[in-house]
Amino acid sequence: MSWLSKLMPSGIRTENTPAKKRSVPEGLWEKCSNCGSALYGPELEENLEVCPKCDHHMAIRARARLAALFDLDSPTTEIAAQLGPVDVLKFKDQKKYGERIKASQKSSGEYDALIAMRGMLKGNPLVAAAFDFAFMGGSMGSVVGERFARAAEVALEVGCPFVCFSASGGARMQEGLFSLMQMAKTSAALGRLREAGLPYISVLTHPTTGGVSASFAMLGDINIAEPHALIGFAGPRVIEQTVRETLPEGFQRSEFLLDHGAIDQICDRRDMRDRIAELTTMMMRQPHPQDADAA
């Protein structure tokens, strides 16, 4: 350091005086993947991960989704939380399945890709499940199927509606036939609900594909989708490569499916709680629920 630098006040910088780096906390700002706007993290979280500039629905964690659904002043009970995946087949591709499980559990903070809970929605009992895409792309393995089936059984015991928010890449290939069996298992669980006359509402979010879309995700008494969600069995690129034709614009998006009768409604995530409360009240022939938010 030169004699001039020693005499210079610390608040004055020159080209040769390095500026102190100001660290920005991780996650404080996020960029909208649709319009590119810089979004303040806490405000985006409060808006349920929906861009306030263009209304683009970004990914949201399963627990945040369920917390936004249930009444805040009522307790919730997680269903089959103790269940965790097991590498029965000792599957290995580029990495061992057991290692993938541990890595996903560490990065996501969840034991598997589906969270199921029992709680209250505007004063009425409800069972709901939500996929966490952060865990291995929301893929469906044995634990996902078992948690879904147990959640349906709880709804059957309580005598209340069942809601599932899907966000999945499909069946988990590392579990082979054990994963494919969950398609039949979950569908059978919904059959028991149907026999009891209890409603099942399926909410399809971005993306809902593969074995999940080919089973319980499309079996709702009412199928609701979030705006511009990708919904289908195979992805559009795979289909184009197979049929060697250009697909229509917006193919497999929720708006396209609504126009062609594949789903019943499209609902903004911020309105989803009120919409589900309205539908379940009507389907259960319950008195108009007390608005827990206003209480």
Swiss-Prot record:
Transmembrane segments: none annotated. GO terms for cellular component: acetate CoA-transferase complex. It is found in: Cytoplasm. This is Acetyl-coenzyme A carboxylase carboxyl transferase subunit beta. It catalyses: N(6)-carboxybiotinyl-L-lysyl-[protein] + acetyl-CoA = N(6)-biotinyl-L-lysyl-[protein] + malonyl-CoA. One of its GO terms (biological process) is malonyl-CoA biosynthetic process. Component of the acetyl coenzyme A carboxylase (ACC) complex. Biotin carboxylase (BC) catalyzes the carboxylation of biotin on its carrier protein (BCCP) and then the CO(2) group is transferred by the transcarboxylase to acetyl-CoA to form malonyl-CoA. One of its GO terms (molecular function) is carboxyl- or carbamoyltransferase activity. Pathway: Lipid metabolism; malonyl-CoA biosynthesis; malonyl-CoA from acetyl-CoA: step 1/1. Coiled coil: none annotated. Belongs to the AccD/PCCB family. Acetyl-CoA carboxylase is a heterohexamer composed of biotin carboxyl carrier protein (AccB), biotin carboxylase (AccC) and two subunits each of ACCase subunit alpha (AccA) and ACCase subunit beta (AccD). Residues 1-20 are annotated as: Disordered. Its cofactor is Zn(2+). InterPro entries: AcCoA_carboxyl_beta, Acetyl_CoA_COase_Trfase_b_su, ClpP/crotonase-like_dom_sf, COA_CT_N, Znf-ACC. Zn(2+) binds at C32, C35, C51, C54. Keywords: ATP-binding, Cytoplasm, Fatty acid biosynthesis, Fatty acid metabolism, Lipid biosynthesis, Lipid metabolism, Metal-binding, Nucleotide-binding, Transferase, Zinc, Zinc-finger. A zinc finger (C4-type) spans 32-54. Binds 1 zinc ion per subunit. It comes from Xanthomonas campestris pv. campestris (strain ATCC 33913 / DSM 3586 / NCPPB 528 / LMG 568 / P 25).
